[in-house]
């Protein structure tokens, strides 16, 4: 077992240097250029909070996310490090079609996701999240996680269900990755959560049964990152989720899977022809 495999198995996450950080840097530059069209004086992504007020934040971020999705900047991070992720997850990979673009301003609890477990929201423990920052995430502004929680039963983490706000389903905030009916864990768990610093060109990789959360950004600079989910195409997962029937899309298939799909398609075509 490699060090990476051991860390994932025991802790529930690992921070790695991406073999090819170029798509992360390219995405960062693309996002900054997009924001500068409306904010020409924006020095860098870290300074975003000084340029956008609360009344415009969600709208601005949603517009930026749509550009991020249209340019397929998130899947490119996986695709241009494909050998690494195929060794980790398998040769048959699906990738999230619209990865989450995260923006957490300093001192804004409404921007950050509290501690949560994604399997409580319909995700599968077979899924892997790749958190790739576009700005440095030092300890004071980092995501937090509970070591070993990915192996514990749901009974160890009871939650309190909040009602869905009217009009929240399918809203820009919902599509940005904020739950419309949050399932809140015990706030006392924060004492067990540790910060996970991640630099630009690195990625935090974790399974979705891990208890984690952004928490309040206690730093002085805005935290921008991509949260890209990938899954083995042969794992028992739903490819659609919530308001998105194409939540996962194919990224790559092994030669065996390609041959199998052609065989199955040929049989289906022959069966359809016989029925006419």
Regions found by a protein language model. Give the residues of each.
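Non-heme Fe(II)/2-oxoglutarate
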Residues: 35, 210-276
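Double-stranded beta-helix
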Residues: 140-210
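A general structural signal for short secondary-structure junctions and capping/turn motifs
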Residues: 5-7, 119-124, 134-136, 195-197, ...
């Amino acid at each position: 077992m490699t060090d990476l495999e051991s860390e994932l198995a025991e802790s529930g996450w690992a921070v790695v240097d991406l073999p090819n950080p170029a798509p992360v840097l390219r995405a960062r530059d693309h996002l900054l250029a997009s924001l500068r069209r409306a904010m020409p004086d924006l020095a860098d992504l870290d300074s975003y909070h000084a340029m956008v007020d609360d009344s415009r934040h969600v709208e601005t971020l949603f517009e930026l996310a749509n550009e991020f999705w249209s340019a397929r900047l998130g899947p490119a991070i996986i695709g241009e490090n494909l050998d690494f992720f195929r060794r980790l997850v398998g040769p048959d990979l699906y990738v999230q079609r619209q990865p989450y673009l995260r923006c957490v301003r300093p001192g804004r609890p409404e921007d950050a996701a509290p501690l949560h477990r994604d399997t409580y929201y319909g995700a599968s423990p077979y899924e892997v999240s790749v958190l790739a920052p576009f700005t440095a995430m030092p300890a004071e502004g980092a995501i937090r996680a509970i070591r070993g929680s990915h192996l514990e039963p749901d009974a160890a983490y009871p939650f309190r269900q909040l009602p869905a706000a009217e009009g929240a389903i399918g809203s820009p905030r919902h599509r940005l990755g904020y739950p419309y009916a949050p399932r809140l864990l015990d706030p006392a768990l924060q004492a067990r959560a540790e910060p996970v610093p991640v630099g630009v060109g690195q990625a935090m990789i974790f399974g979705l049964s891990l208890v984690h959360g952004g928490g309040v950004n206690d730093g002085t600079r805005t935290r921008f990152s991509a949260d890209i989910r990938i899954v083995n195409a042969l794992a028992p997962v739903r490819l659609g989720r919530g308001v998105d029937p194409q939540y996962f899309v194919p990224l790559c298939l092994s030669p065996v899977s390609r041959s199998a799909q052609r065989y199955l398609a040929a049989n289906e075509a022959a069966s359809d022809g016989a029925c006419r």
